[in-house]
């Protein structure tokens, strides 16, 4: 089973959310709980770019994130649903993508616009660039810690109570 199939299975199990469509031939996906006119998410693949949108009242706003690399896209989609899945299954939240800082030695690449805090992606300490156009710095910070792993492996860690072995360092600590 690949990442997309497993994620669809997990989303259906958790909330009855159906994932319909495909990226074949510039297609798209719809993430929907089956409630007509309810807010939902959509993803599409157009002109070499994967984009993820939040939709409300039958309208789709600007993309929450865009990338030309499917693996990066899969990780970003997982960051979008990861903590909600953990809460649904009664597991503690992870601080990854919430309050985690960008990985040491990595940088966020800005668009260069002084009017907005938009990013083009992240760059690793050894110079590898992972494109991800977004204004969500928390998404990029979390991405820096997981992008070198398989999205399927990271998904399975989100589904473990201890988040191990890859994500356990980001388990929320109980307040003292």
How should each PLM-predicted stretch be described?
Residues 1-44:
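N-terminal "first-domain core" detector
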Residues 25, 45-50, 113-118:
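A short, compositionally biased
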Residues 34-62, 176:
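Short aromatic-glycine-(Arg/Gly/Cys) micro-motifs in beta-strand/loop hairpins
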Residues 39-45, 62-69, 123-138:
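Short amphipathic beta-strand/extended segments with alternating polar/hydrophobic composition
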Residues 57-71, 145-149:
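Acidic, aromatic-enriched beta-alpha/helix-loop junctions
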Residues 68-118, 122-125:
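Surface-exposed beta-loop interaction hotspot
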Residues 103-176:
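Intrinsically disordered, low-complexity, charge-dense segments enriched in Lys/Arg
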